[in-house]
Amino acid sequence: MVSMNMFEEVEVEAYVYPTEDIEKVKKAMLNLVPGLKFEAFDKGEYMILVGRTRDKRALQRLYELFRGQQILDTARMMLEEGYFGEEIIIKVHKQVAYVGKVNFNEESPLGPITIIIRTKEPQKLMKWLAPRTKDGVPIE
């Protein structure tokens, strides 16, 4: 289990287009990060749905998915690529998230789900969430 001080907040964002059901987009976001509190911003052509949480268990689902889907190496690479100062930003496929899985292919006609992890300890968080592996086995 992750300690409370490993991150300050997790924010999850997605565009919601008129052809989409906002409740399904919320479900996709909650499948990755449970406990989100939502706000929606109407931009005319689309809405921006933003969910935020400070719950210490917020990243547990991603932790489990990265291991269950055996994608620790890819997850680690994406976390490192998205690491900027005190934020780690990853983008995942919205429709894949709806069925409860993670796919880092953000190329989707409906746009990705963006996960922003705000942390003062990014290295420690990345090591916990997606440790380096050798032959698929965590080594750190």
UniProtKB/Swiss-Prot annotation:
Gene3D superfamilies for the chain: 3.30.1440.10
Cited Pfam families: RNA_binding (PF01877)
InterPro entries, per database record: PAB1135-like (IPR002739), Ribosomal_uL5_dom_sf (IPR022803)
Superkingdom classification of source: Archaea
SUPFAM superfamilies: RL5-like (SSF55282)
Family, as annotated: Belongs to the UPF0201 family.
Name of the protein in question: UPF0201 protein PF1297
